[in-house]
Curated annotation (Swiss-Prot):
Pfam families: IF3_C, IF3_N. Its main location: cytoplasm. This is Translation initiation factor IF-3. It comes from the Bacteria. IF-3 binds to the 30S ribosomal subunit and shifts the equilibrium between 70S ribosomes and their 50S and 30S subunits in favor of the free subunits, thus enhancing the availability of 30S subunits on which protein synthesis initiation begins. It is found in: Cytoplasm. The gene is infC. One of its GO terms (biological process) is ribosome disassembly. Coiled coil: none annotated. Belongs to the IF-3 family. It comes from Clostridium acetobutylicum (strain ATCC 824 / DSM 792 / JCM 1419 / IAM 19013 / LMG 5710 / NBRC 13948 / NRRL B-527 / VKM B-1787 / 2291 / W). SUPFAM superfamilies: Translation initiation factor IF3, C-terminal domain, Translation initiation factor IF3, N-terminal domain. Keywords: Cytoplasm, Initiation factor, Protein biosynthesis. GO terms for molecular function: ribosome binding; translation initiation factor activity. InterPro entries: T_IF-3_C_sf, T_IF-3_N_sf, Translation_initiation_fac3_CS, Translation_initiation_fac_3, Translation_initiation_fac_3_C, Translation_initiation_fac_3_N.
């Protein structure tokens, strides 16, 4: 079987240039250090491929296996791992320094929905003009905001003044 690898991560069959290789059989047994030509013959007899698993080792470690099946299983594992990853979005809720209580309630309900959905929430109080002199009001607003949703979220990054915004990041509570 003459397969030349399309997958550039592995060196297969005739692409192996070293004189001697350490060979692992298709059943996982150690066959020892043998010449590459002999290892290729062993692989051909079993109608399998000789794949360099760690080409940088001295001598390189090669395994006799079905390369097509191996690549298929690798891609299948990668897809499975990708499927299991959870992408966490950061949603932003903007408040002003002079926000009314009812508006805070509405914004906190939106943030609650985001946290329940598993997203992080960035809460920003925006200061205009001289309002930055009264940053303590922004901290009060953020504390009040957090009190309304502390049953579904935790503070990941506490309130901090960054430029003209006071920002706090909330994360969903672990169940």
């Amino acid at each position: 079987m003459k397969i030349i690898s399309k997958n550039k991560n592995f060196i297969v069959n005739e692409e192996i240039r070293q004189k001697e290789v350490r060979v692992i059989g298709d059943d996982g047994s150690q066959l020892g250090v043998i010449p590459t030509s002999e290892a290729l013959k062993l692989a051909e007899e079993k109608e399998l491929d000789l794949v360099a698993m760690s080409p940088n080792a001295v001598p390189p470690v090669c395994k006799i296996m079905d390369f097509g099946k191996f690549v298929y299983e690798q891609t299948k594992k990668e897809k499975e791992n990708k499927k299991n990853q959870k992408i966490v979005n950061v949603k932003e809720v903007r408040l002003s320094a002079s926000i009314e209580e009812h508006d805070v309630q509405i914004k906190s309900n939106n943030a609650r929905k985001f946290l329940i959905a598993g997203d992080k929430v960035k809460v920003a109080v925006r200061f205009r003009g001289r309002q930055t002199d009264y940053a303590f009001k922004g901290r009060k607003i953020l504390d009040n905001f957090f009190e309304k949703i502390n049953d579904v979220g935790v503070i990941e990054k506490p309130a901090k003044l960054e430029g003209k915004n006071m920002i706090m990041i909330l994360a969903p509570k672990k169940a």
